Structures are given as C-alpha cells and as structure tokens.
From Swiss-Prot:
Family under the similarity heading: Belongs to the amidase family.
Keyword Hydrolase found: yes
Reaction(s) the record says it catalyses: a monocarboxylic acid amide + H2O = a monocarboxylate + NH4(+)
Listed EC numbers: 3.5.1.4
Protein name: Putative amidase AmiB2
Organism: Mycobacterium tuberculosis (strain ATCC 25618 / H37Rv)
This protein's encoding gene: amiB2
Length: 462
C-alpha cells in the first residue's frame, strides 16, 4: 500500500493488517514519523514526538505479534493530548508554568498500552485547555490542515490536526465544553464526547468540577469505537462499541433542534443550520422517524456551567508548579474562578441533577437529538491575540454554543462530518444520545457514514 494511503487507512484497518501480517508495527510507525518530520513544522500538531521511545515500543509490539499475541490495538500508533500524563514526559497543559515529568502513566494511557497501542507523542493544547483555538505563548499556534491561516479549534486542536493531516491514525482528546467536538468539526473528523466517567481521568479525577471527559478523535466511527472499547472503565461486554458501530441502529425517533442553548444572542450560519435539516432528510430516507423539537434549556443552565468552568481553571492554575508564568489572560480567568467557593461548587453539583433531568426530558420521547456542530467556521490564527479574558470568551462562545450544555448533563454527544462551508472548511452536525448510550450514537453515526462517507477526504496539508 502507498505510504500516504496507509497513513489515512485508519486504526481499525491498520490493526487488521498488523494481525494478518500484511504490515509490521515498525513499518507503520515510520510512515507517521516521516510524515511528522515533513509536515508538522507547518501545523505544530505535536508538542513533543517520542521518536526513540515510540520506535522501541513498535519493535516490542512486533515481537508480540510475531509470537502470536493479538490485542485490539497491538502495534497501532496513537497521539495523546498534552493534558494526559505519560510516564517520563512533562504534561505542560500548553503552559510555561508546568512542573517536572510525570512519574507514571495516566489510567487511560495504561489502558491504551494494555491494548497494545504505540504512543507517538503529545499534541498541542491552548494554555490550561481554556480556549477553542490552540494558540499559546509557550508553544505557538497549531494550524488547521484544511487552511493554514485558520485554527483547528481547541482545546484538542493538536490531536485533531494530527489525525486530519495523517500524522496519527487516531488520537486521545478531552472535552470540558466541546474540546473534542469543536476541533473535530473544523478538521472534518468524527469525535465523541463519551458519557461522564466512561473513561478514567485519573490522576485528574473530577477535572473542571465534573465537566471534563476523555474521548476519541478519529477518521471513522469504527476507529473511535475501537479506542472507546480499549479505554472504557464502565463494565460491559467486551468489544461492545465496535459491535455497535458494525450493526444497524434500527428505527429511531430523532429530534432536530437548532435552538441555541446559551442566553447570549448567537447567529448560527445558514449553512450550519441547513446541515441539520439535510441530516434530517437523510435520516428520514434511512427509515427513522424525524421530528423538529427543542430540548428544554433552563435559564439557569449557564449559571451552573460557568462557575464550574471558571473554578476548574482556577484549580488547574493553582496546580501549576510556576503559576506566575501563566499568560495574563489565563491568570485573569483563574482569578474569576477563585471567587467560587467549595460550598458553592457543592451546591452547583447538587443542582445539576434537577437541571439535567429537565434538559434530558426530551429523551422520554426521542432516542437522539441532532443539532448544528459549530455555529460558524474557525477563527483566523491570532484573531484574539490582543483581547482580554472576558472579551475573548464572549466572542468565542458565539462560534461554539451547542456543545457545553451536554458537558453539564454528562451524557454522550458526537460530531459527524457533514459538508464544507463557503470557505471550503469542514462542518458537522452533532448527535446527542441518552445517558450511557454511546452504542446508539455509534450505530447511527456509522449508518450516516455509510450513506455519506467522509474518511476519504484529505486536507491540503497532508
């Protein structure tokens, strides 16, 4: 197979080739390392690439394959977001304020290694994962492989840029307010925010006051399912998510909703709105019952989300070895968060139950809710460079208003690549499922992928 085609083949196909002996783990890794050396100076997807260590891991994986061992990801390379600990490597959180190297792997990394994955390196993030654009004073700007003067999104922007450009077959991201779904939308990828606590955050349990989760960034639904099966901590049948991605979803009742959950005035783009109704037409053609209905978003939704968001950032800032080295904008946001007490956080966490029940009441009648992905396309690199904390947040939330509410409720939500906007940049629609029902989202997303394939699309920088 041509090296470029191999780079874009996807993790599931690569795992099969490795198991069948049609490919070796060192050969596959070298495809990615060579592409990184050639392309990543343009993108800055990676903060660090572990060339020697990854090569040693690939050699060890091949020895296990040669000995007849078979694991779901044995020999498959993966990129890790730089808010997740890898033993012997610094976790920077996109900041100059970081401390020394981690002494042990995070639980999610341990699970990936147990499944046989080869760790390529760590991907870039905005400082403390705050913004939906991946730019920091410490590590520069990560660029979108579809258009180099645009952001890939954030905060998992490095992970998404790497997968989109064929610098990794799959990547680990995290999502506390859209940080998987935003960059997957703008990079043309499938991204899944799993159910809260589906994947371990250890040693950073409770990140962002319960809002944040880890999850997969992938070219295809099957690749994401493979990663989810390898990392889930919730007991269930072995391989349940790969099985879900391979089955038909059955006839579902699906609600289309374009109502913006935020109290701020937001104008969603015409193409982004049209994508929802186009998705509805396709879903009807596929045999589903489709209605137009909005969830009940209480006015207090963001009064619950925002204090937890700000306090989470304040906690992260306090945990830095050198908080004085944080960017001024980050310090300002952290100061806002410091005004919210532990008692206030406990009250908000308790109130979440009632809020979530009200928002989730729509799922008494429907299986899945479809919304726009982002409201507009990605910002230009440096667009917010001279802005302060509050003005930046007010502007960026208008681009991505459909994501945060589902971090509050904790249920799974995925973005499915749809089309391209007038600037030739990817768009998506968001699928929201019932609590703990990633399986239905994966089955439905795979059905959409079969009807409207996207994994073959390659950006200009690839």
């Amino acid at each position: 197979m041509d090296p470029t085609d191999l780079a874009f083949a996807g993790a599931a196909a690569q795992a099969r080739m490795l198991a069948d002996g049609a490919l070796t783990a060192p050969m596959l890794l070298e495809v990615y390392l060579q592409r990184i050396e050639r392309l990543d100076s343009h993108l800055r997807a990676y903060r660090v690439v572990q060339f020697d260590r990854a090569r040693a891991e690939a050699e060890a994986a091949q020895q296990r394959l040669d000995a007849g061992e078979r694991l779901p990801l044995l020999g498959v390379p993966i990129a890790i977001k730089d808010d997740v600990d890898i033993a012997g490597e610094v976790t920077t959180y996109g900041s100059a304020g970081h401390g020394p190297a981690a002494t042990s792997d995070a639980e999610v990394v341990r699970r990936l290694r147990a499944a046989g994955a080869v760790i390529i390196g760590k991907t870039n993030v905005p400082e403390l994962m705050i913004m939906p654009f991946t730019e920091s004073l410490a590590f520069g700007a990560t660029r979108n492989p579809w258009c180099l003067n645009r952001t890939p999104g954030g905060s998992s922007g490095g992970s998404a840029a790497a997968v989109a450009a064929g610098l990794a077959p799959v990547a680990l991201g995290s999502d506390g307010g859209g940080s998987i779904r935003i960059p997957c939308t703008w990079c043309g990828l499938f991204g899944l925010k799993p159910q809260r606590d589906r994947i371990s955050l250890e040693p950073h349990d409770g990140a962002w006051q319960g809002l944040s989760v880890n999850g997969p960034i992938a070219r295809s639904v099957m690749d994401a399912a493979l990663l989810l099966d390898a990392t889930t901590t919730v007991p269930g049948p072995e391989g349940e998510f790969v099985a879900a991605a391979a089955r038909q979803p059955g006839r579902l009742r699906i609600a289309l909703s374009t109502r913006v959950p935020t109290p701020l005035p937001v104008r969603c783009g015409k193409q982004e709105l049209a994508a929802v109704h186009q998705a509805g037409a396709l879903l009807r053609d596929l045999g589903h019952d489709v209605v137009v209905r909005d969830p009940d978003y209480p006015a207090s939704t963001y009064a619950n989300y925002l204090p937890r968001f700000f306090r989470g950032i304040s906690d992260d800032a306090d945990a830095q070895a050198h908080p004085d080295r944080l960017e001024a904008r980050t310090r300002a946001i952290a100061r806002l968060g410091s005004f919210f007490s532990d008692r206030r956080m406990a009250a908000l966490r308790a109130a979440e139950v009632v809020l979530s029940s009200r928002i989730q009441s729509i799922f008494d009648d429907v299986d899945v809710v479809v919304t726009p992905g982002a409201a507009t396309g990605p910002s230009r690199i440096g667009a917010y460079q001279r802005r302060g904390a509050v003005s930046t947040l007010l502007l960026v939330v208008q681009r991505v208003p459909y994501f945060q509410v589902w971090n509050l409720t904790g249920q799974p939500a995925a973005v499915v690549p749809w089309d391209f906007d007038g600037d030739g940049l990817p768009m998506s629609v968001q699928l929201v499922g019932r609590p703990y029902d990633e399986a239905t989202l994966l089955a439905l997303a795979a059905q959409i992928e079969s009807a409207r394939p996207w994994a073959h699309r390659r950006p200009s920088v690839s």
